[in-house]
């Protein structure tokens, strides 16, 4: 439960969202989304540990405005979630590239069923995102090295505690010193 609250606090950070100007929600209030999500989870037919899902939608640097990015994020969430799942959408403007975070409840508001996260649902999200970007004259960002990273891995890397990131940094620093594979 506290992990959900931490994720929501992170994506709603006023320093990243222009004092929460770029924070919106559907089917819940962003101020109490963790509590509202938990209420839905308590009513779910299927139980499980997954409280919510977290999507990150990235845009090429300098290609869009925060307002347009936020609107495209809303369109993506509305199309993918079809009005069934409450969500919080934020647009982060503090880095060199604008990006959206969409955290949505793992249980729908209509039949209290869990969201099915699999290769097909991921492909549907990608297709919808790519179409929306093209319709708005934006580049389609290809998945990079971060593809497939779990939230725990992403969070550890963000905090500087990722053993994978540390190992990669060490390897990157010694590769130029090598003259062969031996």
What does each of the following model-derived ranges do?
Residues 1-182:
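N-terminal nicking endonuclease/strand-transfer module with a His-rich metal-binding environment
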């Amino acid at each position: 439960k506290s992990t959900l609250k931490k994720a929501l606090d992170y994506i709603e950070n006023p320093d990243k969202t222009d004092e929460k100007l770029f924070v919106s929600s559907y089917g819940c209030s962003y101020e109490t989304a963790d509590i509202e999500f938990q209420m839905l989870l308590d009513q779910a037919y299927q139980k499980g540990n997954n409280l919510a899902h977290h999507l990150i939608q990235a845009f090429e640097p300098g290609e869009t405005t925060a307002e347009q990015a936020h609107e495209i994020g809303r369109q993506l969430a509305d199309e993918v979630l079809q009005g069934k799942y409450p969500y919080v959408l934020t647009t982060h403007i503090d880095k060199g590239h604008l990006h959206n975070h969409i955290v949505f409840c793992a249980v729908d508001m209509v039949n209290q069923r869990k969201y099915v996260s699999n290769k097909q649902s991921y492909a549907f999200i990608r297709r919808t995102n790519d179409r929306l970007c093209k319709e708005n004259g934006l580049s389609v960002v290809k998945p990079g090295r971060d593809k497939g990273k779990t939230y725990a891995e992403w969070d550890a890397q963000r905090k500087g505690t990722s053993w994978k990131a540390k190992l990669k940094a060490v390897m990157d620093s010694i590769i130029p010193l090598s003259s062969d594979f031996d």
